[in-house]
Regions:
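Mobile active-site "lid"/loop adjacent to the S-adenosyl-L-methionine
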Residues: 125-169
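Short glycine-dipeptide loop
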Residues: 62-63, 170-172, 177-183
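S-adenosyl-L-methionine
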Residues: 1-60
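Pocket-edge positions in alpha/beta enzyme catalytic cores
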Residues: 39, 43, 89, 154-161
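Short secondary-structure boundary/capping elements
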Residues: 43-47, 71, 165
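Conserved S-adenosyl-L-methionine
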Residues: 48-120, 128, 173
Length: 188
């Protein structure tokens, strides 16, 4: 794989992504790097090497489009774009969409769209569906205003509501799959 997990835009820059694992400050003219793992609120980080392996193994030979119903970080979109594929991601937070779209601007066919996945169905058919969905009440996802957007799965008050919205997002994604393609759900 050409995408290493320790280098690349997924390391974040100036807090632009939820995958920031280090923070740099300047004190007395010296750059100090803090690499503790809690700088991003202990958000999980999707491994770009795993993304590349998934795209290369599960994309059909003539496939061109990847859809991610629970967008999150930049990794899968950046890797898909780098491999020459179109990529669309549904993401409920505008700040995450803006950060990821800025990081992937060199790939014109890679886009994060602000939408509630449980209510959104893409207009095109897709050759690979990939999801690394949120876990119930494990992480807190916030937008520019410091609040979780309405419909953000981790902010729902019951597991049943979380499950139902998650599964509706999956159903919407399944409805736009081309025949003989894969839906990959990555957990853990």
């Amino acid at each position: 794989p050409k995408f290493a997990s320790r280098e690349g835009c997924w390391q974040g820059k100036a807090g632009m992504s939820n995958v920031v694992l280090s923070k740099q400050t300047v004190e007395d003219g010296e750059i100090l790097t803090d690499k503790t793992k809690d700088l991003n609120g202990n958000a999980s980080v999707l491994d770009p090497t795993a993304c590349e392996i998934i795209v290369r193994m599960f994309m059909p030979k003539n496939g061109v489009r990847v859809y991610n119903p629970f967008g999150g970080g930049v990794q899968m979109g950046f890797v898909a774009g780098g491999c020459g594929y179109e990529y669309l991601s549904s993401e409920i937070r505008q700040n995450q969409c803006d950060a990821n779209n800025a990081l992937c601007q060199e790939y014109p066919n890679v886009k994060w769209l602000k939408s509630d996945t449980s209510k959104f169905t893409p207009k095109q058919k897709y050759d690979l569906i990939f999801s690394c969905p949120p876990y119930y009440k494990v992480e807190k996802y916030i937008d520019y205003d410091g609040k979780s957007p309405e419909g953000e799965l981790n902010s729902l008050d019951t597991y049943e509501k979380f499950r139902d919205m998650l599964f509706q997002g999956y159903k919407n994604a399944i409805s736009v799959m081309n025949d003989n393609t894969f839906f990959v759900v990555m957990t853990g």
